[in-house]
Amino acid sequence: MENIFDKAQNLKLQERLQKLNRESKPLWGKMNVCQMVKHCQKPLEVAEGKIKLRKSLLGFLFGKMAKRDFLKPGELRKNMPTVSTFKIRETPDFDSEWLSLVSIVKTFGEKGPEVIAEKEHPFFGELTDDEWGALQYKHLDHHLKQFNV
């Protein structure tokens, strides 16, 4: 399974990010490209410990099952619900948010799993380094495909 910590796969993500521009249009969903590049930073910031999410009853009850679903081979479903913390309602500046996303992705490739602040995800529960890396890759890949890159 692809992993954001794998240097070659990380470079491919960076190359795909280079193809985005403020005129990029989604193939599905409600987010515009400016919102998407900011949204994609949020799960990475959770991994880094920059965003603290509380554990929820929903995560306690369904987190392990959802983790299996997210980590299974294949693409994520389109139009999945978004955690309210990750919803971007305003239209942020594309250039600054794009630069931030590229920088974070690059850091994940350079530092590897040492960027992970806590092994326990607030929704999915305990994750290995490989699971953290695979989840981050899969989420980014999903949204890059959403914008046809």
Locations of regions flagged by a protein language model:
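Active-site rim elements
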Residues: 1, 24-25, 87-92, 128-130
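Domain-scale detector for complete catalytic domains at protein termini or as standalone homologs
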Residues: 1-3, 45, 95
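Long, hydrophobic N-terminal alpha-helical segment
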Residues: 1-35, 39
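Metal-centered catalytic cores of metalloenzymes
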Residues: 2-5, 101, 149
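Membrane-proximal intrinsically disordered regions of secretory-pathway and membrane-system proteins
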Residues: 6-7, 103-104, 137
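Short alpha-helical hairpin
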Residues: 10-13, 112-119
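Short, contiguous alpha-helical
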Residues: 23-71, 118-149
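Acidic/histidine-rich alpha-helical segments that form the ligand environment
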Residues: 70-115
